[in-house]
Amino acid sequence: MRRGLLLALVLVLALPASALAHATLEATTPARGAVARAEPAQVVLRFDEAVEGNFGAVRVFDARGARVDDGRVVHPGGTGALLAVGLKPGLPHGSFTATYRVISADGHPVSGGFVFAIGHAGAAPAATVGDLLGGTSAGPVTQAAFGLARGADYLAIALVVGTLLFGLLAWPRDAAGPAAEHAFARRSRTVLAAGLGMGAAAGVAGIVLQGATAGGTSFWAALDPGVVREVLGTRFGAVWGLRLADLVLLGGALLVFGPRRPGAWALPAALLAITPALGGHAATQHPVALLVPLDVAHVVAMSVWVGGLVVLLVAVPAATRALDPPARAVLLGATVTRFSTIALASVATLLLTGTVQSIVHLRAFDDLLHTAFGRAVLIKVGLVLALIALGAVNRRRSVPRLRALAREGHAPGAAGRLLRRTLRAEVALAVVVLGVTAALVSYAPPSALSAGPFSHSTRTGPLEVEATVDPARTGVNAVH
């Protein structure tokens, strides 16, 4: 029974705080492969969710590969799921290729294309959809850098929120003298400064890298002020810009009032924990009123756990060194006992929030084995399992031993060294888990992969072959 519950816990914890599905093209006007009798005024694309049409989102090319759209991309009727681009007047009869590169609600670019004709189907286009989109995708270095920026962003939130809550909930001021209190405060400020600096750097890099990814350009090209303005005009840019401003506000509050005045930092710290939900599908997928609070609770629980581990490793030892050896065990035992209880509550919160989110986002257990998203989850399963095992070692061995040493008036000794070793391993694993989480958000979950038409085009000699399966769901499908 215990093993089954542990496995369920690990599987749930391995799921991302907010599954990030990608937009899917559902229909087009003119239809894919259709022959329009008269020239349409515009090409319209309908997606399964609201998308953003920055960065030259929709383009139309004639058979020779020359652009024939007017470059003005709009949302018809203000509907976020619709995108349209006007066509230049007086187009000749023949085949045309429309391509799209849009931004999903989760901030990820989605691209594709289709062929249609006006009057009659003319010569096959000189370039395939893949050829026309080939120069508009970010390279592997940009994608890897974006993953690092996301991971650093998660770690920064954990460091800042976790350190503040550790000092408020887990630090036993009644067991610490002035010297220990001063040492703890000094090291805590160092952790907070590192988190704030990392968050600011990750935020700036993330905005630029989003411009490179969405526009299919290099990092250096995305430094252009025009590209940055376009990113800030998207939902992704608004959320990441808000987080940057919030980090500045929080840093100012901590600089003026210090971490011991929660009234000064509570609001910006809460906003920092809310922003991941605002930037993901929790804020756009039904039921929003349930998913957003769950996502925020998930982030706070993660921050308490991961940030608390860092404080235990960095700030608490500095505080104990300021005391006589017998008093060290008392302070260390009291701190670890409090944090152990809080960490257990955090794990329970992660279990609850992850369970509900998994019900919303996952379709079948087989998806864990047969999708990139699922395989990434399985990797995270192993890491989380190791993390829980190390925490169990501390709870079952280190905590009781430290309590006993405190009662007997002895120094922490071997128990303290064991605690430090396991904490180092836990922090290292926690950082890797956050990195895997950053990688997970680049994959669409199985629920998104199972919806919408699938199209693929290829060139065979002088012919271009395009196959479309619509709607690419279980049941009746049309193949064109």
Task: Place the predicted regions along the sequence by residue.
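Short proline/glycine- and polar residue-rich coil/turn motifs
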Residues: 74-80
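Short, surface-exposed alpha-helix to beta-strand junction/turn motifs within ectodomains of secreted
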Residues: 43-72
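Contiguous beta-strand segments within globular domains
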Residues: 36-45, 473-480
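Detector for glycine-centered tight turns/loop "hinges" at secondary-structure junctions
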Residues: 33, 65-66, 107, 462
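Bacterial N-terminal signal peptides
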Residues: 7-16
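Short N-terminal segments immediately surrounding and downstream of signal-peptide cleavage
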Residues: 23-38
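Bacterial N-terminal signal peptides that target proteins for export
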Residues: 1-6
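Polytopic transmembrane helical bundles with strong interfacial aromatic enrichment
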Residues: 17-20, 24, 83-93, 97-480
